[in-house]
């Protein structure tokens, strides 16, 4: 998230740390792909080039973080704790919808105090792969979702490039291309791309390094 106003001398040292960012999640038959860039900024300074913005909430449920880094991580930690207790009560893995509801409730309860948006995605045995947006305390399931400051540059691309029934590899490519395009345009997005693929078989983590990112015309 970009800070309002032009940077000042003090903002290079004291600006709030933001995961001003590009996050994305895509459903496929049997799972989901979640991706993010890795740049974290404070004011006009980049304070972390390789921060992993994909935070686990449970074994097969992840959230993608954007907004204030501290606020987003606080919500993720609270949600993970509540979800763990929920799973113990059920004596079975919790649903992705339950995780999304927990994140939604926390986000809405502290909407005046916390500046963060978490996207929840994962797999469960009842609904398979699922993606939920929770911005501002809402809850909506989507076949794919994007968020963060970089998302404003790629709405047209993802609307045109998405097609139902994509394979896991096609979803990873779709996510990588979209985040790369956002990183090229958004000064608050950059670094490497983290990808997590979640299925019934488990969780697959991948990192796309800078020299492995796809090349586009503007480069």
From Swiss-Prot:
Propeptide: 1-20
Post-translational modification: Autocleaved. The resulting N-terminal Thr residue of the mature subunit is responsible for the nucleophile proteolytic activity.
N-terminal signal peptide: none
GO MF, any single term: proteasome binding
Site (Cleavage): 20-21
PANTHER family in the cross-refs: METALLOPROTEASE TLDD, PROTEASOME SUBUNIT BETA
Protein keywords: Acetylation, Cytoplasm, Hydrolase, Immunity, Nucleus, Protease, Proteasome, Threonine protease, Zymogen
Gene: Psmb9
Reactions that this protein is recorded to catalyse: Cleavage of peptide bonds with very broad specificity
Protein name per Swiss-Prot or TrEMBL: Proteasome subunit beta type-9
CDD domains: proteasome_beta_type_6
Native organism: Rattus norvegicus
GO cellular component: cytosol; nucleus; proteasome complex; proteasome core complex; proteasome core complex, beta-subunit complex; spermatoproteasome complex
Subcellular locations according to the entry: Cytoplasm; Nucleus
Active site: 21 (nucleophile)
Coiled coil: none
């Amino acid at each position: 998230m970009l800070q309002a106003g032009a940077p000042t001398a003090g903002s290079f040292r004291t600006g709030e740390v933001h995961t001003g960012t590009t996050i994305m999640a895509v459903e496929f038959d049997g799972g989901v792909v979640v991706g993010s860039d890795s740049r974290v900024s404070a004011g006009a300074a980049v304070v972390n080039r390789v921060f992993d913005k994909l935070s686990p909430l449970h074994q097969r449920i992840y959230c993608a973080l954007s907004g204030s880094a501290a606020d987003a991580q606080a919500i993720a930690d609270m949600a993970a704790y509540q979800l763990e207790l929920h799973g113990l009560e059920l004596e079975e893995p919790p649903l992705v919808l339950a995780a999304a509801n927990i994140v939604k409730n926390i986000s809405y309860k502290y909407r005046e105090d916390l500046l963060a948006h978490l996207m929840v995605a994962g797999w469960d045995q009842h609904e398979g792969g699922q993606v939920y947006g929770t911005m501002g305390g809402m809850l909506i399931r989507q076949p794919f979702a994007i968020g963060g400051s970089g998302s404003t540059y790629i709405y047209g691309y993802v609307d045109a490039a998405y097609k139902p029934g994509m394979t896991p590899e096609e979803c990873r490519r779709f996510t990588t291309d979209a985040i790369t395009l956002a990183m090229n345009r958004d000064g608050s997005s950059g670094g490497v791309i983290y990808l997590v693929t979640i299925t019934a078989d488990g969780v697959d983590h991948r990192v796309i390094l800078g020299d492995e990112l796809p090349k586009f015309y503007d480069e």
